[in-house]
Amino acid sequence: TMTDKATGDTLYRMSFCTLFQEWQATEEATRVRKSFENVFLVPMPAAPAEITVQLYDFHENVAASLKHPVDPKDILIRPVDGKPQTRMLLNSGDSKEKIDIAILAEGYTESEMDIFFKDAESTVENLLRHEPFKSMSDRFNIVAVASPSQDSGVSVPREGLWKKTAVDSHFDTFYSDRYLTTLHLFKMHDALAGIPYEHIIILANTDTYGGGGIYNSY
């Protein structure tokens, strides 16, 4: 929740889930301590504001809370300038009025970008076959973002296969064979700098069934 520092008025509010919260339910979490990257997308306030982040447990009780002040005039807020190569796959209008989805390339080398854009087009076609996207397609903008990887494909730890890719995704998350995720959210959002987006689809260059989704994350 973002509130105006002077008046206390609520400026912005969103709910979220994280891979960290899922990890908390694993057996590993009973034995070791870990930290996870996370990113919150919030509008830049026009005046000093305060952001409150509350983490709830499985019983919907507040388990942790933190507050962070934001001053738009703070000289240490560094802008991230980005001009990624993009291709608009569905353009329904002004991003201020639409839900913007970014499809991010993962495991596609520079020479495979044409393949990525074709795969992204196929992804959109399949997405729009299903509700609510089918009947509400005019409410969405979808853009494909070329984020080239050094290696082709994605990492499979159980096979000893580690690739150098755009957002360092890998299978075997939480030791589940099919679970393909990334822990590197800073890289993911930096790759999208300069374009409007609310939701992210990481399109991995693999034929292996798998993946996952985290509410309001990716």
Task: State where each predicted segment sits.
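Fold-level signature of zinc-dependent metallopeptidase catalytic domains
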Residues: 74-134, 144-154, 160, 186-195, ...
